[in-house]
């Protein structure tokens, strides 16, 4: 963070101000971290985000999955409480309430990021931004001039080219995060971090889970 702040301070000396000294497209970990550091360094900053601050990691990735996993872990402990010499009446769960808790945790963290950006003078613009040229960004009907432009557009879901996949009602990770009904069984394509977190979560809820991974190891 100190290195980033020093970098922005050095850039500041070369500015011929044209509205904002720095425009950032994308409010994920890269974008909001850079915006906060630039704001602390005294630059005028505008940050564009078409969805929610925090990007995939906070809204649709590791933070919400770990929140779901924590609920599943507590449920597991309750089911097997006798192993720890603790008596618990019949354990149960409400997936709708688990999802609601996840959303509450995510919302709190998003608001925390927003508060830090505002505290450092960053102008947050919600909407899909388009680059007109190296010094111009358009969002909605408004045009923003900038001396420097930082692109932190993030990632999107990849649907593997499996024959017939377009004919079935499949989930992406986004659907799985907001699902409020427990399936009888689930096949997960991809044994990476997010895939295995979902596998662990649904397995804890009693779902029969199969993980398909093309590599030799998960």
Language-model features: locations:
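Beta1/beta-strand and adjacent pyrophosphate-binding region of the FAD-binding site
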Residues: 18-28, 184-189
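Rossmann-like NAD(P)H-binding beta-loop-alpha module
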Residues: 181-214
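Extreme N-terminal leader/targeting segments of oxidoreductases
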Residues: 2-22, 40-43
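Short glycine-rich, flexible loops that bind phosphorylated cofactors or substrates
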Residues: 32, 158-159, 195
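Glycine-rich flavin
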Residues: 19-20, 36-43, 48-184, 215-218
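N-terminal Rossmann-like FAD-binding beta1-loop-alpha1 element of flavoenzymes
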Residues: 21-46, 198-203
